[in-house]
A protein has these predicted regions:
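Bacterial N-terminal signal peptides
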Residues: 10-20
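Sec/Tat signal peptide C-region and signal peptidase I cleavage site
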Residues: 21-26
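Short, glycine-/small- and polar/acidic-enriched structural segments
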Residues: 27-161, 168-171, 187-193, 217
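Soluble non-cytosolic domains of exported or imported proteins
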Residues: 66-70, 85, 142, 146-147, ...
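Secondary-structure end/capping motifs
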Residues: 231-308
Length: 327
C-alpha cells in the first residue's frame, strides 16, 4: 500500500517532533492531538477547563494541533500521542501500515441527511463543470490519506479520473482553502465549515461535488486512544472520556457559549459561525459522543470493496467499558 510505505519515516518524524514534551508532572497527563474544525467537546475542554471537575485537578492534557487526521495516526503509531482525533480510513491505515492498536472511545461529527457535506469548490468562471474535467488539474485536499481522501478518491475513479495519475493532488489546509482557490494556486479545493460559509457569503465560487454523493452518512472524525495506553491507564482514560462526553453535552446545551468557544479556537467571526454551527445545515453530533460502530463498519467495508483496505472488523476498536457516553 502506497500510504503504508511512508510509515517508518513519518512515524519517526512524529516522535521527534513531540519528544521534547516532559512527562514528569505531578498529575497524570494525556498527550492529545487535535485539529480543526468540528471538535467542539475538545474545544470546550481547551478553552473552558474550569467547567470540567477532573481536568487540571486529577489529570492534565497536553494539547498538540495537527493539520489533519493522518499525521495524528502516525504520531499515535510512534507512541508520540496517547489519544487523538481520527477518521475511519486514517485509523485503519494506521493498523495496516503502522501496526497501530487503538480503541475508538468517542465520536465527534458525522454527515447527516440534509446537513453539511464536505465538498470541492471551483471558481464561478472555471471551465470545470464536472468531475471528469479535473483531469490535468491541480486539486487541493486537507491531508492526503486523511478522512476525506477515501470517498474523494472513490468518487473520482467512478467518474474516470485516477487520483494518483490524472490530477496533481496537493495538501491545502481547510483554513486556507478559499485563498488557494481564489489566488489560482489550485483549480479545485475541499471546503469545510466555517470556511465554506465564508466563501459562500463572499461569492465567486461554486460547488463541484460533495462527499455525500459517494458515501452518505459519513462518520468524519472520532476519538481514538492507543490500546496499550488505555490498558495501562484505564482510570485516566475513563476520566478523559467522561470529559469528552461532558464537553459534547455542554456544546449542544449552550449554543451561545459554544459559538464563543469555537470562535476563540478557529479565529472565525461569530456571525459566520452563526450561519451554520449546531443548526440543521451543520454536521450531526451524537449527544453523548457515542461512536456509531455500525456506520464505521460500513465505511470499512466500502473501503475494502474499493481495494483501499484489507477486510477489517470494527470490533478490534471496541473497548468493553471505556467508550462514550461515560458519566
Amino acid at each position: 500500500m502506497q500510504l503504508a510505505s511512508k510509515w517508518v519515516l513519518a512515524a519517526g518524524t512524529a516522535a521527534c517532533l513531540l519528544a521534547g514534551v516532559s512527562a514528569s508532572q505531578a498529575q497524570p497527563t494525556i498527550r492529545v492531538g487535535w485539529t480543526i474544525p468540528a471538535e467542539e467537546s475538545k474545544y470546550w475542554m481547551m478553552r473552558r477547563p474550569a467547567e470540567f471537575p477532573d481536568l487540571g485537578k486529577t489529570y492534565n492534557v497536553e494539547w498538540t494541533q495537527f493539520q489533519g487526521t493522518a499525521p495524528m495516526t502516525q504520531a499515535l503509531a510512534a507512541g508520540a500521542l496517547d489519544c487523538a482525533t481520527q477518521a475511519p480510513l486514517s485509523l485503519a491505515n494506521g493498523v495496516v501500515g503502522g501496526n497501530l492498536k487503538a480503541y475508538i472511545v468517542a465520536q465527534h461529527v458525522f454527515e447527516k441527511p440534509g446537513g453539511f457535506s464536505v465538498y470541492w469548490a471551483v471558481k464561478d468562471d472555471s471551465p470545470i463543470r464536472k468531475i471528469a474535467d479535473l483531469k490535468g488539474k491541480t486539486v487541493g485536499i486537507s491531508v492526503i490519506g486523511g478522512g476525506t481522501y477515501g470517498p474523494f478518491a472513490m468518487l473520482l475513479k467512478k467518474n474516470g479520473v485516477d487520483p494518483e495519475k490524472d490530477i496533481k493532488l496537493v495538501e491545502v489546509g481547510f483554513a486556507v482553502s478559499e485563498d488557494a482557490l481564489r489566488q489560482g494556486r489550485v483549480d479545485a479545493v475541499n471546503m469545510n465549515q466555517p470556511f465554506a460559509a465564508h466563501a459562500e457569503a463572499k461569492g465567486g465560487t461554486r460547488k463541484l461535488f460533495s462527499l455525500s454523493e459517494e458515501m452518505p452518512n459519513i462518520v468524519h472524525i472520532l476519538e481514538a486512544c492507543r490500546a496499550d495506553f488505555v490498558d495501562k491507564n484505564p482510570d485516566l482514560v475513563r476520566a478523559y472520556v467522561r470529559d469528552i462526553t461532558l464537553g459534547m453535552k455542554k456544546a449542544l446545551a449552550n449554543r451561545d457559549e459554544t459559538l464563543k468557544v469555537v470562535s476563540e479556537v478557529l479565529k472565525a467571526p461569530i456571525p459566520v459561525l452563526d450561519t451554520y454551527l449546531l443548526k440543521d445545515n451543520d454536521f450531526g453530533r451524537d449527544p453523548g459522543a457515542a461512536p456509531n460502530f455500525e456506520a464505521i463498519q460500513k465505511m470499512l467495508d466500502i473501503y475494502h470493496q474499493a481495494g483501499m483496505l484489507p477486510k477489517m472488523d470494527v470490533a478490534q476498536f471496541k473497548h468493553p467499558t471505556i467508550v462514550a457516553p461515560l458519566q
